[in-house]
Amino acid sequence: MTEQHTPAEAPSVPRAASRVRASSLVGRRWLNTGGDQVTLEDLRGKVVVLDFWTFCCINCLHVADELRPLEAEFEDVLVTVGVHSPKFEHEADPDALDAAVERYEIAHPVLDDPELTTWQAYSARAWPTLVVVDPEGYIVAHLSGEGHVAGLYSLVQELVAEHEAKGTLHRGSGPYVPPAPVARDLKFPGKAIALGGRGTEPGSLLVADTGHHRIVEVASDLTTVLRAVGGGDPAQAPAEAAELALPTPGMRGHRDGGPDEALFSEPNGLLLLPEDVAAEVGYDVVVADTVNHRLRGLSLATGEVTTLAGNGVQKLIDSERVREAARDEEGVAVDLADIDADPLAVSLSSPWDVAWDAAAGRVIVAMAGTHQLFSFDPVARVLSVWAGIGLEGLTDGPADEAWFAQSSGLSVDAEGTLWVADSETSAVRRVRTGDDGARTVDTAVGTGLFDFGHVDGDPAQARLQHPLGVTALPDGSVLVADTYNGAIRRYAPESTDAAGRAVPASVSTVTRGLAEPADVLVEHGEDGAPQDIVVVETNAHRLVRIAVPGEYLTVDEGARQTARPRTDVVAGELELTVGFAAPSGQKLDERWGDPTQLKVSSSPESLLLDGAGTSVGLTRTLRLDPEATEGVLHITARAAACDGEHGRPIPDNAACHLYQQDWGIPVRVHAREAAPEGAETRLDLDLRGLH
């Protein structure tokens, strides 16, 4: 039986008699400081938020967006330091990190921590992790996951009041030095589609100019911009834009209207609707407006932009602004909007790509932020979950039980199979619909969240590295934008040659040496055969055309695993505790019982003899197989809190908040008699821990 645990409410600062001094910030170099090194001693007198992140991680990008208004409000007393601790090998490349900081508009100092030195010093175990340091240099909070912004507001206010009274708060500017702006025609383009005969001129393409927060049409030369919608004109000076009451060049935001008025925020996926559907609904293109958490519609004739789905509030994790709460089967509060509601009232989460399923008559949406696929019927205006339970990982089976991980690319082939670039598992997945209408998910390439590499050959042994794009070819094969390997790869399913002999499935490399390719599309000749490949080369800020090669490459640079430190544990009982303290001004929502939950599993499954499964409470006794040597513990913790005062009932109209984090913790298992010094018999994690 699982022990139940009810966490305590958050105390006011100071929180503990014994305080822990924050560790030094050690890494390879600093970004956004004008070349200066930064130490915690330099930051004395400021409230410091250390944001442990990695640029592949959608949850980390959500946290960066959450922090922007907090940083703006407390700009004279708060310093955020991004500690970049990479998951993938490519993320340790300094040029790749430079590009990511620019692309995601990170406006605070960033410590490059490729060896995870500072990550380990602060006992970080998950991306993202936030550590709050007070103006005297002591750790006061350790937060995992998203959705902490309301609690951070109250915590920062308390710290400012306390240290202003003590005389230990220093107001003024911090160490952030903005980089010099660079003018470009395209800036970190994300996705592209061919317009066929529906563009301004033959052979033109529509491009998500993601870094400029706009959509552009480019000519067949892939460089000439024919027209732009949203974001302002990057060639126009800001003063001129203000004088004309137009959006500032590269302005992000959400606004419907004509091409000069509309605003997007990091748009990515694009879909050209069939002409008959477009005529019925009044727009031609569906846009995945990623950071606005919305689907948008674009008329090619007028440039008019409308909002199709999404209320602008990020689904599930970023629940700080959601005013209504639902409950799942365990009684835990969640902020899922009613999927049967008006699509404009539904919360989405970082839609990254869109594709058309002709058989279903629906737009399929890669909902990267919740690790799911959604569908949208543009005629009936109905939104629904297409596949995925909402947990991050690689699990095949019935669509409503499958696990995805930040799906970022979609393509439907001639047989109706939906191909998915599942970026965080470095996998290519597929969703197939049976004659009975039931959908199933399986994996063509890839093995899990922490396995990657550049290996061709047998799909069972092949490896990718964070692919973001996929396109199906007429011969049944699939091209993959293998983003972090800088390559275009090809998956060919099992087939039969002209002589009737079986040809096994295989993975090969089409081309390499690209700068983070995020999408790939194929141009066909007059005979319908593939002729050229167009690649969206994101970090080169361009589209590039590549001839289809006569032969494909076979590459084997080895399989890799994410280099996370392993925790030595003793076989047998392992006590798991997740700390959670509700922020000031909130209290645990106990109206329907214990509002906390743990979900535990392991890879391999045999690692856990007891303690797997889902139940309420934030403590559990796990039992590890003494025959096991190593593995990964997968832990998901949830807690629900609502605005309210301690000792008083929660008001009926109170805003409720869901806190959630997933951990994948590599462990090395030792027999008790042979365990090294320091091997753990308990595992303490923080969902929201105060010190």
Task: Label the model's feature ranges.
Residues 2-40:
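N-terminal "domain-start" segment that seeds a small globular fold
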Residues 170-190, 222-269, 303-352, 382-406, ...:
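Gly/Pro-rich loop segments of beta-rich domains
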Residues 223, 548-691:
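Extracellular/lumen-exposed scaffold segments
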